[in-house]
């Protein structure tokens, strides 16, 4: 499976905790991430992660393009619902493209765990 990993700044620690918990599962899949999320994963795990631009610099749109062309099967996008994001239109577009292409997307830890436990 090809999995995209994205986290807002206030959720990066939560995503890293999730990734470390399931590193043995994720290691068998192809991973991509926005830049700072990918760097965090690379620095703290043994996982190989293809990194796109930072979300606000177009990374969300790059991952959206990968979804649209059939190159992503799952998205783990831990969003911070309590902080306004300057690139909110990009985030909305990414979530929309997931819906258009019927791509499972987890926007919180509980949903991410359910996806990993039941599908991966």
From Swiss-Prot:
Binding-site residues, substrate: 8, 12, 54-55, 87
Pfam families membership: MGS
GO biological process, one term: methylglyoxal biosynthetic process
Catalytic activity: dihydroxyacetone phosphate = methylglyoxal + phosphate
EC number: 4.2.3.3
Gene Ontology cellular component annotations, sorted alphabetically: cytosol
InterPro entries from the UniProt entry: Methylgl_synth (IPR004363), Methylglyoxal_synth_AS (IPR018148), MGS-like_dom (IPR011607), MGS-like_dom_sf (IPR036914)
Protein family: Belongs to the methylglyoxal synthase family.
NCBIfam families per record: MGSA (TIGR00160), PRK05234.1 (NF003559)
Protein name: Methylglyoxal synthase
Lineage: Bacteria, Bacillati, Bacillota, Clostridia, Natranaerobiales
Chain's gene name: mgsA
């Amino acid at each position: 499976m090809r999995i995209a990993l994205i986290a807002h700044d206030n959720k990066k620690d939560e995503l890293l905790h999730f990734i470390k918990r399931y590193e043995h599962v994720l290691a068998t899949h192809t991973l991509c991430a926005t830049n700072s999320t990918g760097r965090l994963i690379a620095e703290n795990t043994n996982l190989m992660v293809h990194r796109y631009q930072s979300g606000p610099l177009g990374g969300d749109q790059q991952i959206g393009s990968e979804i649209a062309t059939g190159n992503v099967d799952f998205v783990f996008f831990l969003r911070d619902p309590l902080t306004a994001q300057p690139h909110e239109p990009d985030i909305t577009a990414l979530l929309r493209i997931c819906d258009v292409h019927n791509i499972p997307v987890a926007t919180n830890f509980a949903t991410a765990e359910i996806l990993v436990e039941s599908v991966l």
